[in-house]
Amino acid sequence: ALGAAIGIYRAGKTLGKPVHIVVNDPSTSIRPLMAGYINNPDYEPSMFIDRNQAMELVDDNTVVVVVDTNKPSYTECEELLYMTKTIVVLDHHRRGNEVIQNAVLSYVEPYASSTCEMVAEILQYFSDDLRLRNIEADCIYAGIMIDTNNFITRAGVRTFEAAAFLRRSGADMTRVRKMLRDNIDSYKARAEAVRTAEIYRGCFAIAKCPSEGLESPTVVGAQAANE
């Protein structure tokens, strides 16, 4: 979701608008991505704000763009959805029973590999003046890599076209891989889950992922499931 938010941030800045990304409690998976923006003189200190700050900034002209979910309860600040009149939803997950009802634009594309892919497509045709910085292209590219398991699953023609655009915009594979690199504890836990996996009925792998000492065990468990 962070990569898609970064893309929307650049779109808003291209239009000369003040833009903020609402992030309450950054997980270990996105902290390396955020690190390049924090204390960076090219970006305002208010680029990332929490829910309380967001609610203080809302006015009649506020536009809320929700990325990578269409469920109100999954957003970083559900209250914003009821405080603003203009809401845009960009997501690649199928709709369920719980959806954001009052969006003026809801672009939900389940066939896209990721919301980052969708945002990359939008940015290509957004404005001739739009120029992604390298760090921004890296972040969006990283989002595609995560959702496609390094372009192995759910990657289609549009995925690679979006990736090519990001590479032309300055995304670098070496930098992206460094940002996504696991710490040693997460790596060991994932390896242990794979090592102890048992095969059921010849097609189902069942494993227990250790959680001791891990800040985000659910993330590590999901990574192990991709192995």
Residue ranges, per PLM feature:
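Hydrophobic helix-and-loop "lid/oligomerization" segment in the mid-to-C-terminal part
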Residues: 1-38, 54-56, 60-63, 146-227
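A glycine- and small-aliphatic-rich helix-loop capping segment at beta-alpha/alpha-beta transitions
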Residues: 7-15, 40-43, 81-88, 125, ...
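Short beta-turn/strand-loop junction motif enriched in small, turn-promoting residues
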Residues: 9, 71-72, 128
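Short, hinge-like loop/turn segments at secondary-structure boundaries
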Residues: 36-42, 106-108
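Active-site cofactor/cluster-binding pocket
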Residues: 45-105
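Solvent-exposed alpha-helices and their adjacent loops that cap or buttress functional pockets
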Residues: 56-59, 79-82, 99-100, 132-137, ...
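A general structural signal for short secondary-structure boundary/capping elements
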Residues: 71, 111-116, 135, 186-189, ...
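Short alpha-helices
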Residues: 90-163
